[in-house]
Amino acid sequence: MLFVVLLHYTAPLSAVDAIRPAHLEHVERHAREGVFRAWARRDPPAGGVLIAASPNRETLEAILARDPYVLGGVVRPEIVTFSEANVRGLFGG
């Protein structure tokens, strides 16, 4: 299944940036495992966007629960499921 994860900042940018290196390490580790396919900070910096592939929502929720941003209380993740019909080639599905 494919998902868009919208990360909504719930703390000042200075607090977010203090945790950012650990967050990026978490994202990159799961990218190597094939979960996160693309990610970026939103512009203006009000949060982030992740494109994720996961067998199910529960698995993705567990990964997000271990994200340093979530553990640090600086983001609120919003998960949106979307159809893979038009993106299979783009994300290797």
Task: Show the residue positions of the predicted features.
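Conserved, structured core segments of small domains
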Residues: 1-93
